Amino acid sequence: MAHKKGVGSSKNGRDSKAKRLGVKRYAGQFVTAGSILVRQRGTKFHPGNNVGIGGDDTLFAKIDGYVVFERKGKNKKQVSVYPQNVAI
């Protein structure tokens, strides 16, 4: 019994679909509660004020407000959402 497939066959030719990761709402943008801010693998961006983190590390807004990207320590970044009446 032959264990080699004949000519004209390749073991390549597969790829995974793009996962559409990245920042979805930018600094200064108004968002509503539940809006997805960042889709990511791991915590490239950490959750800040009024931002929650999902099981797949997605960051989402907990309140209506404006998006702000901030530094957290020396080399970490965080995303916060502040209500309209708070000065940034």
From Swiss-Prot:
InterPro entries registered for this protein in UniProt: Ribosomal_bL27, Ribosomal_bL27_CS
Gene Ontology cellular component terms for the protein in this record: cytosolic large ribosomal subunit
Keywords carried by this UniProt record: Ribonucleoprotein, Ribosomal protein
Molecular-function GO term, any one: structural constituent of ribosome
Family under the similarity heading: Belongs to the bacterial ribosomal protein bL27 family.
PANTHER family given in the database record: LARGE RIBOSOMAL SUBUNIT PROTEIN BL27M (PTHR15893:SF0), RIBOSOMAL PROTEIN L27 (PTHR15893)
Protein's UniProt name: Large ribosomal subunit protein bL27
Species name: Carboxydothermus hydrogenoformans (strain ATCC BAA-161 / DSM 6008 / Z-2901)
